[in-house]
């Protein structure tokens, strides 16, 4: 999904960053991974994730020796333009046979990294944009699809990081790890941050929810839609002085804006014998549901029904009915999907009463908090039975 469309650097990017889980536990794949990534001819920076650990290590001290032998330090910084990039290793491994509660690792920035970061930022102008890259999110409001809501910081000593970042007014955080959700948390006074609010962005995944999940396409590749309804994809981060705009490019990749959102009727029109999707009788409680991929609470979404004017849709945190339907249809099969999880990028509105028989069109326009605009459309047919 990733390598072929990026050969030749069609987006003209300066470099790439992989925020952890470079491979899935098998560290012997690093050489092959590097060879494949080199085909894109794009400079790559890497961070270790929880799937890049030497699990036989007795503690955190030697957990990343294999990673370091292939990619270098696990935490570092560099400048590019007016941006100071900081990569931190916040995956703390308990050690072989040990655990932090019910997990063999936790989100935690070691003290020696915090000391290094304070010294590093002491030499950085307060006017620069600071981009913090970690594997485990700094903070998120996502859940795991099983109603376990991560309501606090995913990185336990997040507050210690905030203290070091206090002199800076332009910050953006990027992280991976969560294969169920993308989420943008505005870090503000409610988190103990008194400066200019900034975004801690848990990114949608290149691999999606995981390789063994979903239907198999004609290439033999599994559909890897995430539990929040995001397709798998990658990001092009665009920088303008001290501003960053994250552009999520979903699979299948391309510039077509209609690929950036999905429109669903929930519940769907009542199916008729021999009927097709979005053709049938309407329910009194049918809603139009839009999943704006990688969107968030500060984005705006409008619906246009047939020739009608713009109607603002209502933001809501809920599961995506499209994912619910896939989960239900393919449960207990070789093509089963992961359970639907609360999504941070859903908007809905009631399907208007009084729509007559025949074809109807829903057109969607969106504008995200960064000023990016998307459009999409869906037709449906009401049958009077």
Regions inferred by a protein language model and the residue ranges of each:
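Extended active-site neighborhood of metal-dependent phosphoesterases/phosphodiesterases
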Residues: 27-126, 148-174, 178-240, 244-248
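Surface-exposed loops/turns
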Residues: 356-357
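N-terminal active-site segment of His-dependent metallophosphoesterases
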Residues: 1-31, 384-385
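Binuclear metal-dependent phosphoesterase catalytic core
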Residues: 190-295, 299-301, 350-352, 361-381
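Short acidic, glycine-rich surface-loop motifs adjacent to enzyme active sites
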Residues: 19, 121-146
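Conserved acidic residues
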Residues: 14-16, 130, 171, 347
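Aromatic sugar-binding surface patches on proteins
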Residues: 42, 320-350
């Amino acid at each position: 999904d990733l390598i072929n469309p990026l050969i030749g650097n069609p987006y003209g990017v300066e470099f790439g960053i992989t925020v952890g889980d470079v491979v899935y536990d098998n560290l012997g794949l690093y050489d092959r991974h590097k060879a494949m990534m080199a085909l894109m001819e794009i400079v790559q920076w890497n961070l270790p994730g929880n799937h890049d650990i030497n699990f036989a290590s007795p503690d955190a001290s030697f957990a990343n020796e294999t990673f370091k032998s292939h990619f270098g330090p696990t935490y570092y910084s560099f400048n590019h333009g007016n941006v100071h990039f900081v990569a931190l290793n916040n995956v703390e491994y308990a050690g072989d046979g040990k655990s932090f509660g019910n997990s063999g690792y936790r989100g935690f920035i070691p003290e020696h990294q915090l000391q290094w970061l304070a010294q590093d930022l002491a030499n950085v102008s307060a006017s620069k944009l600071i981009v913090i890259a970690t594997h485990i999110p700094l903070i998120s409001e996502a859940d795991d699809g099983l109603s376990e809501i991560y309501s606090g910081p995913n990185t336990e000593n997040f507050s210690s990081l905030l203290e070091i970042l206090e002199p800076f007014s332009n910050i953006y955080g990027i992280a991976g790890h969560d294969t169920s959700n993308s989420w943008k948390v505005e870090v503000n006074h409610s988190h103990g941050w008194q400066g200019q609010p900034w975004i801690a962005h848990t990114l949608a995944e290149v691999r999606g929810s995981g390789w063994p999940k979903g239907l198999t396409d004609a290439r033999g590749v599994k559909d890897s839609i995430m539990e929040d309804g995001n397709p798998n994809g990658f990001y092009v981060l665009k920088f303008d002085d001290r501003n960053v705009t994250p552009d999520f490019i979903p699979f299948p990749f391309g510039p077509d804006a209609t690929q950036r959102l999905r429109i669903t009727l929930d519940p769907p029109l009542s199916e008729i014998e021999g009927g097709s999707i979005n053709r049938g009788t309407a329910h009194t409680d049918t809603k139009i549901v839009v999943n704006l991929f990688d969107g968030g609470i500060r984005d705006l979404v409008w619906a246009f029904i047939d020739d009608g004017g713009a109607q603002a849709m209502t933001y809501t945190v809920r599961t995506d009915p499209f994912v619910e339907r896939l989960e239900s249809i393919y449960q207990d099969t070789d093509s089963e999907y992961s359970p639907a999880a609360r999504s941070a990028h859903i908007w809905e509105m009631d399907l208007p009463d009084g729509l007559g028989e025949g074809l109807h069109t829903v057109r969607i326009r969106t504008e995200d908090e960064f000023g990016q605009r998307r459009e999409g459309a869906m037709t449906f047919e009401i049958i009077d039975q």
